[in-house]
């Protein structure tokens, strides 16, 4: 409903990963300009999740229509010599479920009242990831 071009912001909650495992959710609120596009909002959320929960591992966001987000989980370029990876650190058998829950919950934002995406597809190396 915000049609004014004032600098009003919307608050988007981010649930942090390490606290997921302890079942002790810590929530951080993200202030985003209300008049930014849906893709910009989702990118901002993804950027914060990446830095707060996933060691700054890259993710690429693409919005289809007004309601589907396709998120690609990308590895760091090998030349950067980073010691962290999606595959080894966040998509292994022990933690994959928590990783996907954190990504989905934070990107879907079910409590958010404004226009938002309805569906998230997470991809790693071209494969659609799922919880089973």
Model-identified regions with their sequence ranges:
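Bimodal "functional hotspot" detector
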Residues: 1-132
